[in-house]
Amino acid sequence: MKTIRKKLAVAALAGTALLSASAHAFFGNDDDTLKLGYLVKQPEEPWFQTEWNFAEKAGKEYGFEVIKMAVPDGEKTLNAIDTLAASGAKGFVICTPDPKLGPAIMAKAKSYDLKVITVDDQFLNAKGKPMTNVPLVMMAASQIGQRQGQELYKEMQKRGWNPANSAVMAITADELDTARRRVDGSIAALKEAGFPANQIYRVPTKTNDIPGALDAANSLLVQYPNVKHWLVVGMNDNTVLGGIRATEGQGFDAQNVIGIGINGVDAVNELAKSKPTGFYGSLLPSPDVHGFKSIESLYKWVKDGVEPKKFVEVTDVVLITRENYKAELKKKGL
């Protein structure tokens, strides 16, 4: 039932966004207001709703109209570009449902002379390589990873752990560039802080979700029965949560495990539990910055001919824990 409700919510949001855009296309406005699109793959997610909200704030500040559209798949993405062109839009920001759609999206946009900026996910070309010629606003993977490692070490010191009987469980997905850079950044920060390099153990996950990370973590834990304290590193909240679930299954108390995720939104239920778990906190990125900065750059490109940087890394993150998560999420409209 929960799954059905979520699907209905997605359909409703997608339908509303498309109807709104279609109305612009067929009826237009009475004025000559500049129109720019903002296309997202998962409109039901708080992250993208916040991006939309802050894109609209930029629109109010600079005097342009934001046409919000849901693009959950390739067909809807290409249709949305047709609709934007018909509405008179001059360009769009997009978080694509599939990075491999990059060449098709750019070909369609070029046919209408629309400018494009990508946000959150980078386009890939036919060979699977990043399309670095398309402007991108994205979370800074290596720096976020470094912050994860720094915060883990800081909390470990606060708890007075002995490094001699402590270890790092680094759940990896090295085939994904962002995941690899986050985990590598975290490990580098831990080593720099003084954590013993030979007690950092990498284990690959087959899937980037809780069950996949749980399986990976279990396979690692049984190899090191003498470790008393675990630091858990992963590319996002769910991989870290999988590691936490594994330590619980192996009998570790919450005070002997520290996991810090990345994303924040997926960590809320864990942080809201009545009793603390090994999941200490999460690094909450800035969808507000992504939404405002990406469409602001597009506006200046269209209006003033100021070509945007090809790659803007956003480093703004805040560590949310059981103590502050409600206040920090509220600040970002999540």
For the regions a language model picked out, list residue spans one by one.
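Short, solvent-exposed amphipathic alpha-helices that sit
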Residues: 47-62, 144-151, 177-197, 212, ...
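Hinge/cleft segment of the Venus flytrap/periplasmic-binding protein
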Residues: 32, 170-173, 178, 283-334
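Structural motif
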Residues: 66-90, 203-224, 240-243, 267-268
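Hydrophobic alpha-helical segments within soluble ligand-binding/sensing domains
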Residues: 30, 77, 135-165, 213-214, ...
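Periplasmic-binding protein-like
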Residues: 37-38, 89-97, 115-119, 169-170, ...
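Extracytoplasmic "Venus flytrap"
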Residues: 33-54, 58, 62, 67-79, ...
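Venus flytrap/periplasmic-binding-protein-like
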Residues: 117-127, 233-280
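Flexible loop/hinge segments that line or gate small-molecule binding clefts
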Residues: 105-143, 265-277, 320-321
